[in-house]
């Protein structure tokens, strides 16, 4: 398959998108219905009028053409995409979003579409400054795919430079909310002796360790003694939920001084209170399995994801120097779960 094909939908006997494309597909493409379905799922088939990726549920009545793109094309081209990303603040220098979960910040090999950058290209075209590479226009920091919450995008070169410096010099205050399995304040006898864990004033639990990529599973990060990068997280318990049968959850706020990959998730596991829904950094304990079963009905059928939300950000404005404070509203899945847990709250 070459990089780009335009298919005119002249035959309209089939209305479902995959069948309609198959019926109108030129023989030289040699596309099966299964392959077409895969392309749709990978967001590689578009409406040329709206420049939106199509889905199997797309209404085809008024659809006249579709465009098929290859992997090679998408890897070299940032495609605009109109997505629902709530804006918290915007001026001439920067824009702050409340990123949904299940959204990658910038295109990677496994996610070419549906990223925040695809939306930035749709909204700003090519006006944003290039920061680290051309696939990250305006991006000065990032969040994991399944982490929701506040993310800042620079709109000018001056703003990008200032914000990147603030992140590197640790001048930006970042506070997350996480729903964790267990209560770290009840584990102090077990965890305080571990390397890098200390109890500070006001019941703040600090994890100060080096972190590096796991040599066996490259998707994971791990605490290490040497050769890693310093990561500092401070946990404060905000609420405790007693589910019975030795099952507890805690809502914790976590202020991070550094911004390492998976930092909070790694440190939550280190203090033996992994984040609910985090399958990468879970502990293999019976109580963790039991908690997962107990809260499953409280999710209202929603997909379980790591309950981690970038809740607060405080920065110095790149132009005025004025301190700006932002708070990101909890998404429905997180707030609804907390609401359903309310009857179990003990503190």
Predicted regions and their residues:
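RNA pseudouridine synthases
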Residues: 2-347
């Amino acid at each position: 398959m070459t990089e780009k094909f335009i298919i005119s939908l002249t035959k309209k006997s089939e209305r479902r998108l995959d069948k309609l494309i198959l019926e109108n597909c030129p023989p030289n493409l040699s596309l099966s219905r299964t392959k077409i379905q895969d392309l749709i799922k990978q967001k590689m088939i578009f409406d040329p009028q709206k420049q939106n990726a199509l889905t199997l549920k797309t209404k085809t009545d008024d659809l006249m053409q579709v465009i098929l793109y290859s992997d090679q094309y998408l890897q070299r081209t940032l495609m605009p995409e109109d997505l629902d990303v709530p804006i918290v603040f915007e001026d001439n220098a920067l824009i702050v979003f409340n990123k949904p979960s299940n959204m990658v910040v910038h295109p990677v090999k496994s996610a070419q579409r549906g990223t925040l950058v695809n939306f930035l290209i749709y909204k700003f075209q090519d006006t944003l400054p290039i920061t680290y590479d051309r696939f990250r226009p305006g991006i000065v920091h990032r969040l994991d795919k399944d982490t929701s919450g506040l993310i800042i995008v620079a709109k000018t070169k001056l703003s990008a430079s200032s914000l990147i410096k603030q992140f590197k010099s640790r001048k930006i205050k970042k506070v997350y909310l996480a729903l964790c399995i267990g209560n770290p304040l009840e584990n102090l006898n077990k965890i305080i002796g571990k390397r890098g864990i200390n109890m500070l004033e006001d019941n703040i639990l600090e994890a100060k360790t080096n972190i590096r990529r796991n040599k066996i599973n490259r998707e994971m990060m791990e605490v290490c003694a040497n050769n890693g990068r310093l990561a500092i997280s401070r946990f404060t318990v905000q609420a405790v939920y007693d589910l019975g049968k030795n099952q507890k959850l805690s809502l914790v706020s976590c202020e991070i001084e550094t911004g390492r990959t998976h930092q909070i998730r790694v440190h939550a596991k280190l203090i033996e209170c992994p984040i609910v829904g985090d399958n990468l950094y879970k502990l293999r304990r019976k109580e963790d399995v039991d908690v997962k079963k107990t809260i499953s009905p409280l999710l209202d059928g929603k997909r379980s994801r790591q309950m981690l939300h970038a809740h607060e950000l405080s920065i110095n404005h790149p132009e005025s120097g004025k301190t700006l404070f932002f708070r990101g509203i909890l998404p429905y899945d997180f707030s609804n779960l907390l609401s359903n847990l309310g009857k179990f709250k003990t503190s």
